[in-house]
Amino acid sequence: CMFYAFTNGTLIDEEFCKDMQRLGNISLALSVEGFEEVNDSRRGSGCFEKVMHAMDLLKEHGLIFGTSICYTSKNYKTVTSDEFLDMLIDKGVRYAWYFHYMPVGNEAATDLLLTPEQREYMYHRIREIRGFEANLCI
């Protein structure tokens, strides 16, 4: 039995990784929404650096982990670019969950919603990635 947990990764440290190794049946999906500038604009200053450090620790401890990516009208091409995917693979990411942005609440940013054309692009691009990226399950 395997358990998956979604996290921003900011509290992952050596002790946490050792606990994950001891348990042996948990995999984390770390939230990332692009490279540093875009990620930190949505998740807070310094989050990108913290999640990259968390990925390094998880990889060093031989733990299987992935990423959770919320794509928007602003980042959809970046988070499906070869450069971004190569970075994730180099960091040790083994799978990626892609979620389209859904505005929630009274002050949600509706400008981040994808257009029908952008959604179609994502539909085809994710299938293309699935066919070529042998080291990453999407």
Annotated model-derived regions:
Residues C1-H100:
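Radical SAM/AdoMet-radical enzyme domain recognition
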